């Protein structure tokens, strides 16, 4: 499931393009060899409409009806959070490239794998850089964040960096 419509559609289309490019490249190079067998990839897409409930329904459909054995994650922490319990329930590995909320990785999921740093580290070095550019002196930081899990994780990382550097919010 991927967001082809709704509020995440722009990023969903970019994610789909990236997945397609990777699969085309892997398949053009002969596929992946595992245990003496060679496998080529095929991706099945359904539009989750940027809706977590719909994403979870489609993940279940992909596993139960379409028989997928491996899942590539959707765009956003919220949609990944909706799909992860489904992939966990059926023991289907999911590699997600677009969900970085810390809360995704505190649930003990055995089948969820990430390629991104956690969201709380996104702006960590930005505060360090600001302090460095300020001659090593603490800085004042203005913050404005959305109320979703991802944004709040980024916010917590900024607060940690502010505290660590002696800066102020």
Please report, for each region that a protein language model flagged, where it lies by residue:
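Acidic/histidine-rich, surface-exposed loop or edge segments in extracytoplasmic proteins
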Residues: 1-7
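Active-site pocket-shaping loop/turn-to-helix segments
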Residues: 7-16, 117
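Short clusters of hydrophobic/aromatic residues that line enzyme substrate/ligand-binding pockets
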Residues: 8, 32, 104
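N-terminal cofactor/phosphate-binding cores enriched in small/glycine residues
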Residues: 12, 19, 58
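Extracytoplasmic ligand/sensor domains, especially the bilobed periplasmic-binding protein
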Residues: 17, 53, 68-169
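Signal peptide-proximal N-terminal region
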Residues: 17-42, 136, 163-168
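Extracytoplasmic
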Residues: 38-41, 57, 63-66, 89, ...
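Short, well-structured alpha-helical segments in soluble
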Residues: 44-45, 49-69, 131-133
